């Protein structure tokens, strides 16, 4: 995981922008677990946190439930997500942000 500045953001980085707090912390842990071998970029900006990986970022319900220690409806992230970078697809079990030229 790295802390970078917005100026350092590569145009190929994708992922959610989440309100800071316990859920954001759990999303960071889950994104790290769901994207093995990828560098996870975390940029804290006061009230929100940018969580990005290069070209493809996965977040599974199983990983976020493990990070939170309780069951969780994945769609509830959308209420806490002020924005995202890239394209997004979602299902009951996974959210994915990806880069497509």
From Swiss-Prot:
What role does it play? Effector component of the alkene monooxygenase multicomponent enzyme system which catalyzes the O2- and NADH-dependent epoxidation of short chain (C2 to C6) alkenes to their corresponding epoxides. One possible role of this small protein might be to facilitate electron transfer between the reductase and ferredoxin components.
What species was this sequence derived from?
Xanthobacter autotrophicus (strain ATCC BAA-1158 / Py2)
User: Would you tell me the Gene Ontology cellular component terms?
Assistant: cytoplasm
Coiled-coil-forming residues are none
Query: What is the designated name of this protein?
Result: Alkene monooxygenase system, effector subunit
Gene3D superfamilies, sorted? Monooxygenase component MmoB/DmpM
**Per its UniProt entry, which superkingdom is the organism in?**
Bacteria
Give the SUPFAM superfamilies listed for this entry.
Monooxygenase (hydroxylase) regulatory protein (SSF56029)
- Where is the protein found, in the record's own terms? Cytoplasm
Q: Name one Pfam family in it.
A: MmoB_DmpM
Q: What upregulates or represses it?
A: Induced during growth on aliphatic alkenes (such as propylene, ethylene and 1-butylene), epoxides (such as propylene oxide and 1,2-epoxybutane) and chlorinated alkenes and epoxides (such as vinyl chloride, cis- and trans-1,2-dichloroethylene, 1-chloropropylene, 1,3-dichloropropylene, epichlorohydrin, and epifluorohydrin). Repressed during growth on other carbon sources.
Subunit structure, as described in the record = Monomer. The alkene monooxygenase multicomponent enzyme system is composed of an electron transfer component and a monooxygenase component interacting with the effector protein XamoD. The electron transfer component is composed of a ferredoxin reductase (XamoF) and a ferredoxin (XamoC), and the monooxygenase component is formed by a heterohexamer (dimer of heterotrimers) of two alpha subunits (XamoA), two beta subunits (XamoE) and two gamma subunits (XamoB).
RNA-binding is among the record's keywords? no
* Annotated keywords: Cytoplasm, Plasmid
* Single GO MF annotation: monooxygenase activity
Quick one: where is this thing mainly located? Answer: cytoplasm
Q: Which family does it belong to?
A: Belongs to the TmoD/XamoD family.
